[in-house]
Amino acid sequence: NKNTFLVSIDMPAGTVLENTDRVARAIGDYIRRIPEVKDYETFVGTGSVMDFNGLLRGGAFREASHFADIRVNLIDKEERSLSSEKIVLAIRPDIVKLAKEYGANIKLVEDPPGPPVRATVVAEIYGPDYAKQRELAGDIRALFAKTAEVVDIDDSVKEKQDKYQLVVDKEKAALMGISTEQIVQTLRLSVAGMAISTLHRPDARNPVAIMLRLSKADRTGLADMDK
Protein backbone atom coordinates (compact mmCIF):
# COMPACT_ATOMS: atom_id res chain seq x y z
CA ASN A 1 0.00 0.00 0.00
CA LYS A 2 2.13 2.87 -1.31
CA ASN A 3 1.39 6.57 -1.58
CA THR A 4 2.36 6.81 -5.24
CA PHE A 5 2.15 5.03 -8.59
CA LEU A 6 3.26 5.71 -12.16
CA VAL A 7 1.34 5.85 -15.42
CA SER A 8 3.70 5.08 -18.31
CA ILE A 9 2.52 6.14 -21.78
CA ASP A 10 3.99 4.81 -25.05
CA MET A 11 2.83 6.24 -28.36
CA PRO A 12 3.92 4.82 -31.74
CA ALA A 13 7.52 5.74 -32.58
CA GLY A 14 7.70 9.01 -34.48
CA THR A 15 4.68 10.57 -32.78
CA VAL A 16 5.19 14.32 -32.38
CA LEU A 17 5.47 15.74 -28.88
CA GLU A 18 2.19 17.64 -29.16
CA ASN A 19 0.19 14.44 -29.78
CA THR A 20 1.89 12.65 -26.88
CA ASP A 21 1.13 15.65 -24.68
CA ARG A 22 -2.52 15.49 -25.75
CA VAL A 23 -2.79 11.91 -24.46
CA ALA A 24 -1.01 12.76 -21.21
CA ARG A 25 -3.34 15.72 -20.61
CA ALA A 26 -6.43 13.58 -21.24
CA ILE A 27 -5.27 10.95 -18.75
CA GLY A 28 -4.25 13.69 -16.31
CA ASP A 29 -7.73 15.22 -16.50
CA TYR A 30 -9.16 11.82 -15.54
CA ILE A 31 -6.68 11.31 -12.70
CA ARG A 32 -7.36 14.70 -11.13
CA ARG A 33 -10.98 13.65 -10.49
CA ILE A 34 -10.00 10.65 -8.34
CA PRO A 35 -10.75 11.52 -4.67
CA GLU A 36 -7.68 9.68 -3.34
CA VAL A 37 -5.25 11.60 -5.58
CA LYS A 38 -3.28 14.34 -3.83
CA ASP A 39 -1.42 15.64 -6.90
CA TYR A 40 0.35 14.44 -10.03
CA GLU A 41 3.23 15.50 -12.27
CA THR A 42 3.46 14.90 -16.01
CA PHE A 43 6.68 14.30 -17.96
CA VAL A 44 6.28 14.47 -21.76
CA GLY A 45 9.14 13.53 -24.07
CA THR A 46 11.16 12.26 -21.12
CA GLY A 47 10.90 9.80 -18.28
CA SER A 48 9.84 10.64 -14.74
CA VAL A 49 12.37 11.35 -12.02
CA MET A 50 14.60 8.30 -11.88
CA ASP A 51 14.33 5.91 -8.95
CA PHE A 52 15.69 2.41 -8.37
CA ASN A 53 12.58 0.82 -9.85
CA GLY A 54 12.77 3.02 -12.96
CA LEU A 55 16.47 2.31 -13.36
CA LEU A 56 15.83 -1.41 -13.63
CA ARG A 57 12.82 -0.95 -15.93
CA GLY A 58 14.79 1.17 -18.41
CA GLY A 59 13.39 4.57 -17.47
CA ALA A 60 16.66 6.23 -18.48
CA PHE A 61 15.92 5.37 -22.12
CA ARG A 62 12.55 7.13 -22.26
CA GLU A 63 13.95 10.23 -23.96
CA ALA A 64 11.81 10.61 -27.09
CA SER A 65 8.76 12.53 -28.28
CA HIS A 66 6.51 9.45 -28.14
CA PHE A 67 7.08 8.76 -24.43
CA ALA A 68 5.34 10.27 -21.40
CA ASP A 69 5.08 9.47 -17.69
CA ILE A 70 2.60 10.63 -15.06
CA ARG A 71 3.73 10.34 -11.45
CA VAL A 72 0.62 10.19 -9.25
CA ASN A 73 0.81 10.94 -5.53
CA LEU A 74 -2.01 9.69 -3.30
CA ILE A 75 -3.13 11.08 0.02
CA ASP A 76 -1.47 9.36 2.96
CA LYS A 77 -2.55 5.76 3.42
CA GLU A 78 -3.66 6.60 6.96
CA GLU A 79 -6.24 9.00 5.50
CA ARG A 80 -7.84 6.70 2.90
CA SER A 81 -9.78 3.46 3.08
CA LEU A 82 -8.60 2.01 -0.24
CA SER A 83 -5.10 0.64 -0.76
CA SER A 84 -3.03 1.88 -3.68
CA GLU A 85 -3.43 -1.55 -5.29
CA LYS A 86 -7.23 -1.34 -5.19
CA ILE A 87 -7.15 2.21 -6.55
CA VAL A 88 -4.96 1.18 -9.49
CA LEU A 89 -7.16 -1.85 -10.21
CA ALA A 90 -10.29 0.33 -10.12
CA ILE A 91 -9.03 3.02 -12.50
CA ARG A 92 -7.13 0.74 -14.89
CA PRO A 93 -10.07 -0.07 -17.24
CA ASP A 94 -10.94 3.61 -17.72
CA ILE A 95 -7.34 4.66 -18.35
CA VAL A 96 -6.74 1.77 -20.77
CA LYS A 97 -9.91 2.69 -22.67
CA LEU A 98 -8.88 6.34 -22.80
CA ALA A 99 -5.36 5.47 -23.99
CA LYS A 100 -6.69 3.24 -26.78
CA GLU A 101 -8.69 6.18 -28.17
CA TYR A 102 -5.35 7.87 -28.87
CA GLY A 103 -3.52 4.72 -30.00
CA ALA A 104 -1.37 4.66 -26.87
CA ASN A 105 -0.04 1.72 -24.87
CA ILE A 106 -0.03 2.35 -21.12
CA LYS A 107 1.34 0.67 -18.02
CA LEU A 108 0.32 1.39 -14.44
CA VAL A 109 3.36 0.77 -12.27
CA GLU A 110 3.38 0.50 -8.48
CA ASP A 111 6.55 0.44 -6.42
CA PRO A 112 7.19 -3.24 -5.63
CA PRO A 113 7.21 -4.43 -2.00
CA GLY A 114 10.56 -6.12 -2.58
CA PRO A 115 13.49 -5.67 -4.95
CA PRO A 116 12.44 -4.04 -8.26
CA VAL A 117 12.13 -6.17 -11.38
CA ARG A 118 11.59 -5.40 -15.06
CA ALA A 119 8.13 -6.98 -14.94
CA THR A 120 6.24 -9.64 -13.02
CA VAL A 121 6.61 -12.04 -15.96
CA VAL A 122 9.34 -11.67 -18.60
CA ALA A 123 9.84 -13.90 -21.66
CA GLU A 124 13.24 -13.59 -23.33
CA ILE A 125 13.81 -14.79 -26.89
CA TYR A 126 17.27 -15.59 -28.24
CA GLY A 127 18.38 -16.66 -31.70
CA PRO A 128 20.36 -15.61 -34.80
CA ASP A 129 17.30 -14.78 -36.94
CA TYR A 130 15.83 -11.41 -35.87
CA ALA A 131 12.82 -11.79 -38.16
CA LYS A 132 11.99 -15.08 -36.42
CA GLN A 133 12.47 -13.42 -33.04
CA ARG A 134 9.96 -10.72 -34.01
CA GLU A 135 7.48 -13.38 -35.12
CA LEU A 136 7.83 -15.36 -31.89
CA ALA A 137 7.55 -12.17 -29.83
CA GLY A 138 4.22 -11.44 -31.50
CA ASP A 139 2.99 -14.97 -30.78
CA ILE A 140 4.02 -14.80 -27.13
CA ARG A 141 2.49 -11.36 -26.73
CA ALA A 142 -0.80 -12.67 -28.12
CA LEU A 143 -0.61 -15.59 -25.68
CA PHE A 144 -0.08 -13.22 -22.75
CA ALA A 145 -3.07 -11.15 -23.90
CA LYS A 146 -5.28 -14.24 -23.62
CA THR A 147 -3.99 -15.11 -20.15
CA ALA A 148 -6.19 -14.16 -17.21
CA GLU A 149 -4.84 -11.53 -14.79
CA VAL A 150 -2.04 -10.50 -17.18
CA VAL A 151 -2.08 -6.76 -17.97
CA ASP A 152 0.22 -4.01 -19.30
CA ILE A 153 1.82 -6.19 -21.98
CA ASP A 154 4.79 -4.70 -23.82
CA ASP A 155 7.77 -5.86 -25.85
CA SER A 156 11.17 -4.58 -26.96
CA VAL A 157 10.56 -5.13 -30.67
CA LYS A 158 11.58 -1.99 -32.52
CA GLU A 159 8.96 -0.53 -34.81
CA LYS A 160 9.87 -0.12 -38.45
CA GLN A 161 10.71 3.46 -39.37
CA ASP A 162 9.59 4.86 -42.71
CA LYS A 163 12.25 6.75 -44.63
CA TYR A 164 11.32 9.25 -47.31
CA GLN A 165 13.63 10.57 -49.99
CA LEU A 166 12.64 13.81 -51.68
CA VAL A 167 13.92 14.07 -55.25
CA VAL A 168 14.21 17.49 -56.84
CA ASP A 169 12.78 17.89 -60.34
CA LYS A 170 15.84 19.72 -61.64
CA GLU A 171 14.32 20.50 -65.04
CA LYS A 172 11.24 22.14 -63.54
CA ALA A 173 13.38 23.95 -60.96
CA ALA A 174 15.66 25.30 -63.69
CA LEU A 175 12.66 26.61 -65.66
CA MET A 176 11.57 28.50 -62.54
CA GLY A 177 15.06 29.83 -61.92
CA ILE A 178 15.51 27.90 -58.68
CA SER A 179 18.62 25.88 -57.89
CA THR A 180 18.69 22.53 -56.10
CA GLU A 181 20.70 24.16 -53.33
CA GLN A 182 17.97 26.74 -52.72
CA ILE A 183 15.33 24.01 -52.45
CA VAL A 184 17.43 22.00 -50.00
CA GLN A 185 18.14 25.07 -47.87
CA THR A 186 14.44 25.99 -47.80
CA LEU A 187 13.45 22.48 -46.67
CA ARG A 188 16.17 22.47 -44.04
CA LEU A 189 15.09 25.89 -42.80
CA SER A 190 11.45 24.77 -42.62
CA VAL A 191 12.09 21.57 -40.68
CA ALA A 192 15.37 21.92 -38.77
CA GLY A 193 15.55 25.70 -38.67
CA MET A 194 18.43 28.03 -39.37
CA ALA A 195 20.17 30.78 -37.41
CA ILE A 196 19.52 33.96 -39.41
CA SER A 197 20.93 36.51 -36.99
CA THR A 198 21.94 37.11 -33.38
CA LEU A 199 20.39 39.13 -30.59
CA HIS A 200 22.65 41.07 -28.25
CA ARG A 201 20.95 41.50 -24.88
CA PRO A 202 22.45 43.87 -22.32
CA ASP A 203 21.86 41.34 -19.51
CA ALA A 204 23.46 38.40 -21.38
CA ARG A 205 27.15 37.70 -21.72
CA ASN A 206 26.82 35.83 -25.03
CA PRO A 207 24.68 36.70 -28.07
CA VAL A 208 21.45 34.73 -28.55
CA ALA A 209 20.83 33.06 -31.91
CA ILE A 210 17.63 34.00 -33.74
CA MET A 211 16.22 30.82 -35.28
CA LEU A 212 13.81 30.82 -38.21
CA ARG A 213 11.69 27.74 -38.92
CA LEU A 214 8.10 26.61 -39.28
CA SER A 215 6.00 26.07 -36.18
CA LYS A 216 5.67 22.46 -34.98
CA ALA A 217 2.05 22.42 -36.11
CA ASP A 218 3.21 23.06 -39.69
CA ARG A 219 5.94 20.40 -39.78
CA THR A 220 4.34 17.30 -38.29
CA GLY A 221 4.34 15.16 -41.43
CA LEU A 222 5.32 14.74 -45.04
CA ALA A 223 2.05 16.32 -46.22
CA ASP A 224 3.25 19.65 -44.82
CA MET A 225 5.91 19.75 -47.54
CA ASP A 226 3.15 20.26 -50.14
CA LYS A 227 1.97 23.51 -48.59
Which residues does each predicted region cover?
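Surface-exposed amphipathic alpha-helical segments in non-transmembrane regions
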Residues: 6, 19-39, 51-162, 174-227
